[in-house]
Amino acid sequence: MKKFLFFAVVALAMVSCLNKGAFSQSYTADVTFECSTHEYTHFFKDSVYVMSNPEDQGFLYGQYPLFWGQIQKNGDFMGGFLMSYLKGEAQGKLDKEPSSNDAYRVHSPSGALGSMTYVVFYDNPVESMMPKYDLEFGYKGLGTCMPLGCYVNNTTLVARKIKEHFKDGDKLVLKAKGTTSVGKVTEASIVLAEYTEAKDSVMYNWTPFQLSSLGTVDYVDFEVVSTNPEVPGYFCLDGYLASIKVEY
């Protein structure tokens, strides 16, 4: 039986009504991943939160968006999502010595819009080490979910590997694939880094990633594609927005 850790979600515009015995609720979910003092104290270790056993694999926000992660029996994180409030350096600096947790550290001094907490996603190239779904609409049988967007950024580890190994022609791209239970597939993408003869660009600031082109979906799966195998598939996500409607 899968269990979830519950966190708050801000409903920006909510309408609920009862009509002939039916319940209807429509709102825009703004997922910021901020936690209470109790949650930071009891669930996070070294500023990172990973589910403690293979039965506890998801973050459930406002009952509807499910962010999945995969861990082994010994508790090692393998792929998908975890939460972090590790902070990096500003404006692309890499002056500090490398750390073992740089994979889970955003390469910015805070989360998006100054928030404390964000999620880190790892696209493990070994498929069996990944959760079945990355992001799931929990009430997909009772309503609809249309992702609107989020903020994304690189981790410190990725920024360091790019600096060490990227050459002209190399590129790092984040892809989001939306699917429904009937098989409809939609996609969106954003460039996280690109080296060309004219310019080298690396994402060092929280950047909007528009997801409305995915339309109404049941699941969103992420893929990090690099032309250079030395750059691992991590990225940071914060401020997830989705338009949700539930009826029952």
Spell out what each predicted region is.
Residues 174-248:
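Terminal, low-complexity interaction segments
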